[in-house]
C-alpha cells in the first residue's frame, strides 16, 4: 500500500502544477514573451546583458501569467459554457476562486520584484499598467460591453515589445511604439478569425463578439480592412530606419499571405479557412518579429540611425 501511495503522489503534484500552469495560457504567454525579448534586442546595437534578458523575460512572463489567471477567474462561468474553454481548471471548478486569486497575486508580486531588481522601475510600472489594462479594463469592462472590445483593449496585448525595449533602454521611444502598433493592428484579424469559427461557442457565452452582434460578412470585411492597415503598419520599421531590405521583403511576403487568407475568407467563407487564417496569423507574427531581429544585427540594406 505504501509503495502505491508513493507512486501516485508525484502524478497528483504534476496534475496540480499543470492546472495552475493552464491558468497562465502558456501558448499566448510564450508569444508575448517572445515579442518582449525581440523588443529587448532591438533596443540595443549589441548584446542584451544576461541579467536584464533573463530577469526581464521572467518578470514579463510572471505578470502575463498573473493577468491571464485573473482573466480565467473573472470568466470562469462563461468559460464553462464554451467547449473551447470548459476544460480550464477555473471553469471546471478544480481550482477555486481564492486559489486562483492568490496564485495571480503571487505571480504579479514576483513579477514586480523581478523587474524592479533585474530591469528598472519604468518597466515594472509599465508592465503593471499593462496588467491592469488586460485584467481589469479589458476583461471586466470592455469585453462584456462592446463588440469592439478586442480593438479598444488590444493595446494591453500589444505592449510586450515596448516592455522589452524599456527593460534595456529605460525609455520607450518611437521605435518601440511602432512595434506596439504592429501587434495592435494584428490583433483584430487574428482574434476575429478565431471568433468566426468558434462563434457557436461565443453565442452561448453572451459576450458581444463581432460575429455575433454584426454577423459574418461584416466581420469578414473588418478582418480584410484591418489586415490592410496591419500590412501598412509593418512597413513602418523600414520607413523609420529600424530595418533594411530583408525585413521589408519578409514583411511584404508575409503580409501578402495574410491578405490572401483574409480575401479568401471574404469571398467564400468556411470555418476551415478561418481556422487556417488564425493559425497563419500566429506564424505570421513570429516570423515578422524574427525577421526584424535578424535584419537588426546583420544589416541587410540601408538602416537609419534611429537607435
From Swiss-Prot:
Classification via CDD domains: PT_UbiA_Cox10
Pathway listed: Porphyrin-containing compound metabolism; heme O biosynthesis; heme O from protoheme: step 1/1
Other known facts: Carbon 2 of the heme B porphyrin ring is defined according to the Fischer nomenclature.
Coiled-coil annotated residue ranges, if any: none
Chain ranges passing through the membrane: 28-48, 50-70, 100-120, 122-142, 149-169, 176-196, 218-238, 243-263, 282-302
Single annotated GO MF: protoheme IX farnesyltransferase activity
The protein's role, per its UniProt record: Converts heme B (protoheme IX) to heme O by substitution of the vinyl group on carbon 2 of heme B porphyrin ring with a hydroxyethyl farnesyl side group.
Membrane-protein topology: Multi-pass membrane protein
Organism the protein comes from: Ralstonia nicotianae (strain ATCC BAA-1114 / GMI1000) (Ralstonia solanacearum)
Disulfide links within the chain: none
Gene it is expressed from: ctaB
EC number: 2.5.1.141
Family: Belongs to the UbiA prenyltransferase family. Protoheme IX farnesyltransferase subfamily.
Cellular component, GO, one term: plasma membrane
The protein's name: Protoheme IX farnesyltransferase
